[in-house]
């Protein structure tokens, strides 16, 4: 006969904590929920004190998120069964499934909860191997990292009837010309791009290219000189050109 089990629920949304607690009372009356907590740090403290058999762990929580809590538990001596409560997309769910980890998707489904509870009970049998929590956490951590933005490295631009591929390293500055943008390069050539300056700017690395005027975007590395006259007007010298800097963009050169 299986001994009664205990559980802890960690979720920063009070309504969801209590909702899950009520659902567990319905689908698994023998399960004793020993604590409801609202953040990751409270979860770790309560788990250490109460040592529940099961932890229902929301992934996104203040203080420590669910992944950080699970990583700490996975390194410790006491390792409860973890059920992640998640609003993650399908790719993360596949990671759960590959590692045979229990998870509940928000909004909570009673059918899914029943299935999870049955799997937990079955897993108490000594012949069942424990899931590889560490491998799952590594996958989740990778999924949690924001993707690095991909900025333009090469630009397709026209010179006469020909299309050229220009490295952004060779660009001095871009200048808006009605429906086009002209590309001014180190080779003292001017190319045309058929897009607005706003569209182009969204694809450029903001650390390398600054919009200094509504009509101009300059390669910061190409700036040779910054000047300010007695009236407060600022300009930069790029190549052989002197380009005006709008008052709204002068903060970019503070400290220069």
From Swiss-Prot:
This protein's GO CC annotations: cytosol; protein-DNA complex
Residues modified as 4-aspartylphosphate: 58
Pfam families: LytTR, Response_reg
A GO biological-process term: regulation of DNA-templated transcription
UniProt-listed SUPFAM superfamilies: CheY-like
GO molecular function ontology, one term from the record: phosphorelay response regulator activity
UniProt KW Lipid metabolism keyword: no
Ranges for domain HTH LytTR-type: 155-256
Occurrences of domain Response regulatory (ranges): 6-121
Keyword match Transcription: yes
InterPro entries membership: CheY-like_superfamily (IPR011006), LytTR_DNA-bd_dom (IPR007492), Sig_transdc_resp-reg_receiver (IPR001789), WalR-like (IPR039420)
Coiled-coil regions, chain positions: none
UniProt KW keywords: DNA-binding, Phosphoprotein, Transcription, Transcription regulation, Two-component regulatory system
Name the UniProt record assigns to this protein: Uncharacterized response regulatory protein VV2_1193
């Amino acid at each position: 006969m299986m001994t009664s089990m205990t559980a802890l629920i960690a979720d920063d949304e009070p309504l969801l904590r209590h909702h899950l607690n009520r659902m567990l009372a319905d689908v698994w009356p023998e399960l004793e929920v020993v604590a409801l907590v609202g953040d990751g740090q409270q979860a770790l403290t309560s788990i250490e004190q109460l040592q529940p058999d099961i932890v229902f762990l929301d992934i996104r929580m203040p203080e420590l998120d669910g992944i950080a809590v699970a990583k700490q538990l996975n390194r410790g001596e006491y390792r409860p069964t973890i059920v992640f409560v998640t609003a993650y997309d399908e790719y993360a769910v596949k990671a759960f499934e590959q590692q045979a980890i229990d998870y509940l998707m928000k909004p909570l489904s009673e059918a899914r909860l029943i299935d999870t509870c049955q799997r937990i009970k079955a897993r108490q049998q000594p012949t069942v191997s424990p899931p590889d929590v560490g491998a799952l956490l590594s996958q989740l951590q990778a999924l949690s990292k924001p993707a690095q933005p991909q900025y333009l490295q090469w630009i397709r631009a026209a010179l006469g009837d020909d299309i050229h591929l220009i490295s952004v390293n060779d660009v001095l500055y871009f200048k808006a010309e009605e429906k086009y943008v002209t590309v001014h390069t180190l080779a003292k050539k001017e190319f045309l791009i058929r897009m607005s300056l706003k569209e182009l700017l969204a694809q450029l690395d903001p650390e390398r290219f600054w919009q200094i005027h509504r009509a101009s975007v300059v390669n910061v590395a190409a700036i040779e000189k910054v000047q300010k006259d007695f009236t407060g007007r600022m300009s930069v010298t790029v190549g052989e050109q002197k380009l005006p800097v709008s008052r709204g963009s002068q903060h970019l050169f503070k400290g220069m």
